[in-house]
Swiss-Prot record:
This is Proline--tRNA ligase. PROSITE patterns: AA_TRNA_LIGASE_II. Its EC number is 6.1.1.15. It comes from the Bacteria. GO terms for molecular function: aminoacyl-tRNA deacylase activity; ATP binding; proline-tRNA ligase activity. It comes from Acinetobacter baylyi (strain ATCC 33305 / BD413 / ADP1).
Length: 570
């Protein structure tokens, strides 16, 4: 590609509305332009990167045995009504009607469409297992699109869906997809971690997320220092450590006027929050008459509730909803002063986090306004219904597999794989004839990669004060050739043209910067756009039989002979 025929839409200043580095650099490097909130036009520089990401994804998916399809982004609402997600999905699902008043949605995902395809095309167990994938546009009507293409409303995704006769077959494909994703992200040049994850609104059982490590990541990911254990913070297990000591203090009630938070109480009493418990009162599942019980959760004072874990408890309503003021008043409780003493006797279910369950002589609310209790002990002073893992893990917690301790880092989710089970196949009646001649509900898996998000996450992980530092596999160009004074020096231009043709013939993706611009402008553009290799050709170098080479991360350029240069590029 000749730069004189390419769109270099670079910006010298950072746009004010760009918060994260990937958004800033994608705008400055001329990769994208904003059309509307959460909607972006991809310019030629960005499309080249997108195409390279898609090519790697497509190669590895084909290698895995998956079959490529292409499904409409516009989907009949009736399919979503069949699955139950038309209402459940919420306002992120864009709903509309065509001119014939038929309801449609703009697809945020394609479980319904692929299941409809499968129920019409798959007839026998002999056709299974089978795995379909596509690379297609999605639309989610985010309430607050942010961070450029990191959280946009319209985006490109690779989504795959597999169909099986049983769980064992699904597990084989799931493991295959896990390995495939590891190959994809390795080839993309990303520092990533696969982690155990919650299935969320997609549903199903087993699930793994793939995170690119970056300080700007929105998610906390947890991994062991000495094993391959890894999970997102929603899923990471907090193990029980230690045993409860025998009581050494008598229970005492102390005045704590206007001290409602654990931090306030412990400061007021000059106590360690680790030696206290805090109460969270939530709503349970309604009974047959519609009555909603209140459930009391207790955690150690310095720990935070993991709402996803709480929602998975069979007695707690999902989504997690905290008890109302009216419910507290009916129970005779005051927010900020609730302790476990006497709650079981009142008929409440009391669930205690593992770490809180081993405390003795701790501080708790006294179930009376402006008062707390010290020297509280389980069994003697307060009963509980059960012990349950309720909290977020913290740095230094023991790893659940018994190897090492946990570390927490920030990550950007770029991939997610699920074992869906029969959630969608049952809802849409997707069956095949089994080997006994009877209808068999198929078992499903789904596997997604955010293609546009991969581009942004690669930048979040690879940049400096000059611009992007692309992994070679996805750089818009691998090599840039800059002929000095090309418009005045036929000798330089001729040498540049010859090297350009030779490198292209060897399979390199080369940019010949033949623009009539100052060298400083060209060098700044090439550093900003992240091209890995820069070759400068000048008359002095040609006379000496050398080329000036500089790698994107090199501090200084070096003069190389042609043979040395070609060896350097390999």
């Amino acid at each position: 590609m000749r730069a004189s025929r390419f769109l270099f839409a670079t910006l010298r200043e950072t746009p004010n509305d760009a918060e994260v580095i990937s958004h800033q650099l994608m705008l400055r490097a001329g990769m994208i332009r904003k059309l509307a909130s959460g909607l972006y036009t991809w310019l030629p520089m960005g499309v080249r990167v997108l195409n390279k990401v898609e090519a790697i994804v497509r190669e590895e998916m084909n290698r895995s045995g998956a079959l490529e399809v292409f499904m409409p982004v516009t989907q009949p609402a009736s399919l979503w009504e069949e699955s139950g997600r038309y209402v459940q999905y919420g306002p992120e699902l864009l709903r509309f009607k065509d001119r014939h008043d038929n309801p449609f949605v703009l697809g945020p995902t394609h479980e319904e469409v692929i299941t409809d395809l499968a129920r019409n095309e798959l007839k026998s167990y002999k056709q299974l297992p089978i795995n379909f994938y596509q690379i297609q546009t999605k639309f989610r009507d985010e309430i607050r699109p942010r961070f450029g293409v990191m959280r946009s409303r319209e985006f490109i995704m690779k989504d795959a869906y597999s169909f099986h006769v049983d769980q064992a077959s699904l597990q084989e494909t799931y493991d295959n997809m896990y390995d495939t994703y590891c190959r994809i992200f390795t080839r993309l040049g990303l520092d990533f971690r696969p982690v155990q994850a919650d299935t969320g609104s997609i549903g199903g059982s087993g699930s793994h997320e793939f995170h690119v490590l970056a300080d700007s990541g929105e998610d906390d990911i947890v991994f062991s220092t000495e094993s391959d254990y890894a999970a997102n913070v929603e899923k990471a297990e907090a193990v029980l450590v230690g045993e409860r000591a025998a009581p050494a203090q008598a229970l005492s009630i102390v005045d704590t006027p206007n001290q409602k938070t654990i931090a306030d109480v412990c400061t007021f009493l000059n106590a360690d929050p680790k030696q206290s418990v805090k109460a969270l009162l939530v709503q349970g599942n309604a009974d047959e008459k519609g009555n909603v019980p209140v459930i009391a959760l207790f955690l150690r004072g310095d720990h935070e509730l993991n709402e996803i874990k709480a929602e998975h408890h069979p007695l707690i309503a999902a989504p997690l909803t905290f008890a109302t003021e009216a419910q507290l008043q009916e129970l005779g409780l005051t927010a900020g002063y609730v302790g476990p003493q006497g709650l079981v006797e009142k008929g409440l279910t009391v669930i205690v986090d593992r770490a809180a369950s081993v405390l003795s002589d701790f501080i708790a609310g006294a179930n009376e306004a402006d008062k707390h209790a010290t020297g509280v002990n389980w069994e003697r002073d307060a009963k509980f219904s059960e012990i349950y893992d309720l909290r977020n893990v913290v740095d230094g917690d023991p790893s659940p597999d018994g190897q090492g301790v946990l570390q927490i880092k920030r990550g950007i989710e770029v991939g997610h794989i699920f074992q869906l089970g029969q959630k969608y196949s049952e809802a849409l009646n997707c069956t095949v004839l089994g080997d006994d001649g009877k209808p068999l509900v198929v078992t499903m898996g789904c596997y997604g990669i955010g293609v546009t998000r991969v581009v942004a996450s690669a930048i979040e992980q690879n940049y400096d004060d000059k611009g992007i530092i692309w992994p070679s596999a996805i750089a818009p160009f691998e090599i840039a050739i800059v002929p000095m004074n090309a418009h005045k020096s036929p000798k330089t231009l001729e040498a540049a043209e010859a090297l350009y043709a030779e490198l292209q013939a060897q399979g390199y993706d080369v940019l010949l910067d033949d623009r009539n611009e100052r060298p400083g402008v060209k060098f700044s553009d090439l550093e900003l756009t992240g091209i890995p290799h820069r070759i400068v050709i000048g008359e002095k170098g040609l006379d000496a039989g050398t080329f000036e080479y500089k790698g994107r991360t090199d501090a200084e350029s070096v003069n190389l002979t042609k043979d040395e240069l070609l060896a350097k590029l390999k």
